[in-house]
Amino acid sequence: MMNSRMIQKKHNKKKVYDGKNISVNIHNVSFRKKKFKREIVEQKSASAVLAFDGKGNVLLVRQHRFPHGFVFEIPAGTLGKNENPRVCAIREFIEETGYKPKKLKHLINYYPFIGYNTQKIHCYVAQDIEKVSEIKLEYDEFLTLVKMDFKKLLKMIVSGKIVDSKTICAALTYANSKKV
């Protein structure tokens, strides 16, 4: 049961930055008769796909992510305006891999930065994929498609070699559901 005395009340907000991928607002809030400010990053939500090729491998992309360097991650992308997360997942998966999932099941949603960011990640699992096109990248994307044994992916997560949060959440949620 939610207690209304535990909720911070928003009075107003001021936009202090408006960029291509994020905007930053300062919210004036009160809680227990005290006033303070909250810095909130508004960011588009995204969809991601943990996809299996039918041979125990997952499809990952390896790309350079400034400022962190090269990373392995599951295919993903931001939702367009009013875009359904499932539609976004399929679109991004085709663009980044050239494959289309015949079966796509919702896996988990999560907020990667719950205390100060509005972004929500929608994760799906794909089985029974088929090659439908070549990879279609944005002007600022460069990636390599990598097929990796799922158990190797899990070992790389545990060893700290996979550091991408959506990949970690999707893989561990899936592994737990299948008792891998």
Question: PLM features: residue spans?
Answer:
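A short, amphipathic edge element
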Residues: 3-14
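Conserved Nudix-box catalytic region and its N-terminal flanking loop in Nudix hydrolases
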Residues: 5-7, 41-43, 47-91
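Hydrophobic residues on conserved beta-strands that form the core of alpha/beta folds
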Residues: 10, 24-26, 37, 61, ...
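Acidic, metal-coordinating catalytic segment for phosphate/diphosphate chemistry
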Residues: 12-50, 54
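Short loop segments at secondary-structure junctions
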Residues: 32, 53-55, 64, 126-131, ...
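Unchanged
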Residues: 36, 43, 47-48, 77-165
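A general structural signal for well-ordered alpha-helical segments in protein cores
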Residues: 58, 72, 150, 168-171
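Long hydrophobic alpha-helical segments typical of transmembrane helices together
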Residues: 161-180
